[in-house]
A protein has these predicted regions:
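Conserved H-loop
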Residues: 288
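A post-motif C-terminal structural segment
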Residues: 300-304, 309-318
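Acidic/histidine-rich, metal-coordinating catalytic segments
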Residues: 292-299
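Feature for exported/extracytoplasmic and membrane-associated proteins, marking the mature portion
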Residues: 2-285, 304, 318-384
Length: 384
């Protein structure tokens, strides 16, 4: 086999030999969902009582009679209505106004800042999770659905990546098995990587059997789209006792420069439908208290709409935190619509405060890469 073919097969594996012996003991799992492209926070968590909202957005403002109102001032986009049970159970936290000083409107640079937890004028080669999570030779610490996640780059974390669990088990592993059987002594490193990778497959057999029992791969109650199916796979992974410390997913399409009403509405509907099914399944299987779901996006959108029925790259935006141990409700302060800076919202909560909360309250880490004096944790998670 050509070297490039081999590399394409093993891409995404970094599993230590000791990972194979890890038991199926339950553990806490953080599920990170990237709303890729920059979600418009102002039409997600809506300050409908502020008259400036409809003034800034004469055609994009969600009509009052369609809003899912949380209180007398704040509402959610109607497409998020399937999260109502989670909200009513006080298991949905909405962190308002997340951003950082001297915001950058470039997708690439702002993405780097969010994934590395760096300052606006600082360059880092490692992701904030790679810097935060302690190394464990005895476990697979992360599962990545889709492209490699920058929050995990650098360091020595053990991870495995896949597009879909079913596809991974049916297509990629047979090729790896054939390659492993043909490896010779001169390919000792290759043989070692393959052996460890294939051994991890044994722990996925329960997942494979469950997938086969489900029949057609249509996503079911999660929804018939790639994100929904990947979230369904993640739920099955957690329910099967294979939860790593971190699972990452991406929901693409939030760069809504035009036709935003329809595009964002569909994306938020896909998000809420899949998350509602995910929560229901984990509650049924007794793993909801062990799971924390957090959304993030590289930036929000401009306060005002553009001439194309959309919004351009902006700054601050809200994010969601869901789980059985979450302290639900509104956290932080909605950015002012009357005190804009260069036509942008001014952030009220630094996004690294969210990361500090995860390190302190979810993983109970006394030390992490986050400067907790500058970025104090929010009160988001109940103790176990």
């Amino acid at each position: 086999m050509h070297r490039r073919n081999f590399l394409s097969l093993i891409a995404g594996f970094a599993v230590s030999p000791a990972a194979i012996a890890k038991s199926n003991a339950r553990k806490q799992c953080l599920l990170l969902i990237e709303l890729q492209g920059g979600n418009d926070g102002l039409n997600t968590v809506i300050p409908f009582a502020d008259k400036a909202y409809s003034t800034l957005r004469p055609t994009l403002a969600i009509k009052n009679d369609k809003l899912w109102k949380l209180d007398e001032k704040t509402a959610l986009h109607p497409s998020l209505h399937k999260l109502n049970d989670c909200w009513q159970a006080d298991q949905l936290a909405i962190v308002q106004g997340l951003g950082y000083e001297n915001p950058n409107r470039s997708h690439f640079r702002s993405h780097d800042i969010w994934t590395s937890a760096s300052e606006f004028d600082q360059r880092k080669d490692s992701g904030w999770l790679a810097d935060t999570l302690p190394e464990e030779n005895s476990t697979v610490q992360a599962v990545i659905y889709g492209n490699r996640s920058s929050v995990l780059q650098g360091g020595e974390l053990n991870y495995i990546s896949m597009h879909r669990t079913r596809e991974f088990l049916s297509a990629k592993l047979p090729k790896l098995q054939a390659l492993e059987s043909n490896a010779n002594n001169s390919q000792r490193h290759v043989h070692s990587v393959l052996k460890n990778t294939l051994a991890y497959q044994q722990r996925l057999r329960a997942v494979a059997k469950s997938l086969e029992a489900k029949g057609p791969d249509d996503g079911g109650e999660f929804g018939n789209n790639l994100f929904a199916k990947q979230l369904q796979d993640a739920a099955l992974l957690i329910s099967s006792g294979l939860a790593p410390s971190v699972i990452t997913l991406h929901l693409k399409g939030f760069d809504t420069h035009a036709n935003q009403i329809e595009r964002q509405g569909k994306l938020l509907e896909n998000l809420s439908t899949a998350l509602a099914a995910f929560r229901a399944q984990l509650i049924q299987n007794g793993h909801w208290d062990d799971t924390l779901v957090v959304t993030w996006s590289e930036f929000g959108r401009r306060a005002g709409e553009n001439a194309s029925g959309g919004t351009d790259h902006g700054t601050a935006a809200p994010q969601f935190v869901l789980g059985g141990r979450v302290k639900g409700g509104l956290h932080g302060q909605q950015p002012s619509l009357s005190e804009l800076q260069n036509d942008d919202l001014v952030h009220t909560v630094d996004f690294r405060q969210l990361y500090a909360s995860l390190a302190e309250q979810w993983w109970t880490l006394a030390d992490s890469s986050i400067n907790k004096k500058r970025y104090p944790a929010l009160d988001l998670v109940k103790s176990a």
